[in-house]
Curated annotation (Swiss-Prot):
The keyword Cell inner membrane applies. Produces ATP from ADP in the presence of a proton gradient across the membrane. SUPFAM superfamilies: Epsilon subunit of F1F0-ATP synthase C-terminal domain (SSF46604), Epsilon subunit of F1F0-ATP synthase N-terminal domain (SSF51344). F-type ATPases have 2 components, CF(1) - the catalytic core - and CF(0) - the membrane proton channel. CF(1) has five subunits: alpha(3), beta(3), gamma(1), delta(1), epsilon(1). CF(0) has three main subunits: a, b and c. This is ATP synthase epsilon chain. The keyword Electron transport does not apply.
Amino acid sequence: MAAMTYHLDVVSAEKKMFSGVVQKIQVTGSEGELGIFPGHAPLLTAIKPGMIRIVKQFGEEEFIYLSGGILEVQPSVVIVLADTAIRGTDLDEAKALESKRKAEEHINNSHGDVDYAQASAELAKAIAKLRVIELTRKAM
């Protein structure tokens, strides 16, 4: 028996990152983690900075960093419109570690809500990139 699947498109402002048949995806929505399986109810939600975990048609996994965006779920197709999307294999670990260090430094030295909020957002993005790098390595 063939696994149930649906079509997924992951698109950023720069290019189409993924287009193909998948078994499921996992992504961080505005209200928390979402697992999208075939037959999921229609949904439109914001995506928080993090990753999308894609389980392809034959079980192979792929991880893509998303800086945020929109997730649209329809009966036979799911579309991710990302602000920025970077494949796990294309992320620079040294750069992500440096971004994390700088964000932590800004948080510790912030003077006001705006500085703190911006530094917290940058820290979340850096941590998400590092997580995608880690999971991509494990999947290889």
